[in-house]
A protein has these predicted regions:
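Solvent-exposed coil/turn segments that connect beta secondary-structure elements
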Residues: 51-53, 61-63, 83, 98-102, ...
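Penicillin-recognizing serine hydrolase domain
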Residues: 29, 33-34, 40-41, 147-263
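Short active-site loop at a secondary-structure junction
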Residues: 45, 58-79, 91-99, 117-129, ...
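Short, well-structured active-site flanking segments
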Residues: 82-100, 216-225
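Conserved catalytic neighborhood of penicillin-recognizing serine enzymes
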Residues: 103-140, 240-259
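Beta-lactamase-like hydrolase cores
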Residues: 5-6, 12-71, 82-91
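Second-shell loop/turn segments in exported
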Residues: 36, 60-68, 110-117, 124-129, ...
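Solvent-exposed, polar/charged alpha-helical surfaces in well-ordered, non-transmembrane soluble domains
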Residues: 55, 78, 82, 124-128, ...
Length: 263
């Protein structure tokens, strides 16, 4: 079965490889039953690739530099899975939340979930909370654990990996997609502009996504469920619904969609 990886900046809509224009894209989307797909949902940049070969099937404004927002977390997760492949950590590795982590979790202006200082969280739980509810605090917890609380080192790793993969128009300034200044001093890289958003393109995200799924397909077991629960049966239990409404069982579920990261 052919796997298709779609990278859409601004919206995820139904695509077909035979499309010839952006207008046709919107017409086909609405004709497929997605009547809510008004002009406000038109993707600003789009790239559709064959997930088996990496061949480009459709593109529009694929090389325009944009802020990937929460899709930035996919690069952090890529490095986490790389660390697991090297035996540096495992899904069962325990990370104990710090008072700083709890303080970040309490910043409601950015996407977060409840994290309590002193509570143990497995890497698997942190991956789930990073991928599904798009938690900024769990993203930072993973990055900090792997760099001994050195945010600059993690950003260096993100940027080095991007160059290695051939992502020529990408620059990371934070680990999660939220500008560092939004963390109110609890996450402050010293060699990177704390007010700067991350920069990438649809093409670069497709390169990263293609390599991620090829090398570490287990990420999809975290991203393919419409609802997930962490720390079940404990006082810290939380249940999250996916923001990727194309996942089977979600609002606009499509058979075969296995997710990865929304923006």
């Amino acid at each position: 079965k052919k796997k298709i990886v779609a990278v859409l900046l601004a919206a995820c809509l139904s695509l077909a490889p035979s499309l010839s224009s952006a207008d046709e894209l919107m017409d086909i989307t609405r004709a497929a039953g997605y009547t809510e797909a008004t002009e406000a949902y038109r993707p600003k940049s789009t790239l559709l690739i064959d997930g088996n070969t990496g061949d480009v099937l459709w593109e529009e404004n694929a090389d325009e530099v944009r802020d990937p927002a929460s899709m930035s977390k996919a690069m952090t997760l890529y490095l986490v899975f790389e660390a697991m492949s090297k035996g540096e950590i495992s899904e069962d590795t325990v990370i104990t939340a710090t008072p700083t982590d709890q303080a970040i979790a309490d910043i409601y202006e950015i996407s977060n979930n409840k994290i309590v200082a002193g509570v143990d969280y497995t890497v698997s739980e942190l991956i789930t909370m990073t991928a599904v509810p798009s938690s900024n605090v769990t993203t930072v917890m993973l990055a900090n654990y792997l760099t001994n609380n050195d945010p600059d080192k993690w950003l260096d790793m993100m940027n080095e990996k991007s160059k290695e993969l051939g992502m020529t128009n990408t620059k990371w300034f934070n680990a999660s997609g939220a500008v560092a200044v939004a963390f109110k001093g609890y996450y402050s890289p010293q060699r990177y502009d704390n007010n700067q958003t991350n920069q990438t393109t649809a093409r670069d995200l497709a390169i990263m996504t293609y390599n991620f799924i090829k090398k570490y397909p287990d990420i999809l077991k975290y991203t393919s469920k419409p609802v997930v629960t962490v720390k079940k049966g404990t006082p810290y239990e939380e249940t999250f619904e996916t923001y990727n409404y194309s996942i089977p069982g979600a609002k606009y579920g499509i058979d075969g969609v296995d997710g990865l990261k929304t923006g």
